[in-house]
A protein has these predicted regions:
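Amphipathic, charge-rich alpha-helical segments that serve as recognition/docking helices
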Residues: 35, 97-178
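Short, charged/polar connector segments at secondary-structure boundaries
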Residues: 1-104, 110-117
Length: 179
């Protein structure tokens, strides 16, 4: 993977993978069917709203391959789906249209072109996909680690409201930690 090229893509030009093991759709499923399944089973509302509010996280790699004339998303189907519906709200399934918040112009600008690593083929990416989704990866912080981080950020001058937003906690919870 370290020698795979990295390219910029408009998410609307990427093809969601019908073979994505997260969802069960026919191999010839339309992109609309895949998006619907992603919304139904893969918490796209939450992810799209997080991206709409905060943008994409740097360092989260998307992996694509060129397959049958399409640029197929092998890793990052949830993120790409989220970006697609933020860029083109008409792609949002009817049942979810009211649930997606409108992104800022800055976020729209940032997600119009996203970086992806280009695998030479699907097979070459299999090992990476397996490691990413089945083996221990990023270890979640313990509650104590979160408290230490909040205290350090506060000591560095970060406002309580900002720390609370970063950690998805109430301001009161942060105040209790930094006392």
């Amino acid at each position: 993977m370290s020698n795979w090229p990295s390219e910029q893509f408009n998410p609307l030009e990427l093809t969601l993978d019908p073979l994505n093991p997260r969802i069960e759709v026919p191999e010839n499923a339309s992109q609309a069917d895949i998006i619907s399944a992603m919304f139904e089973y893969e918490e796209i509302v939450e992810l799209a709203n997080k991206i709409a509010a905060e943008g994409m996280l740097p360092g989260e790699r998307i992996i694509v391959t060129r397959e049958n004339g399409f640029v197929m998303v092998l890793e990052g189907n949830r993120r790409v789906t989220s970006c697609q519906v933020l860029l083109n709200p008409s792609l949002i399934p009817e049942a979810y249209k009211r649930d997606i918040i409108k992104p800022t112009e800055d976020v729209l600008h940032d997600i119009r072109n996203i970086q992806a690593d280009v695998s030479p083929d699907r097979h070459s990416a299999e090992r990476i996909l397996t490691i990413r989704h089945t083996e221990p990866g990023i270890k979640k912080w313990t509650p104590i680690a979160k408290m230490r981080r909040a205290a350090r950020l506060y000591d560095l001058g970060e406002p309580v409201a900002s720390i609370a937003k970063m950690q998805g906690a109430s301001e009161e919870a942060v105040r209790r930690v930094i006392r």
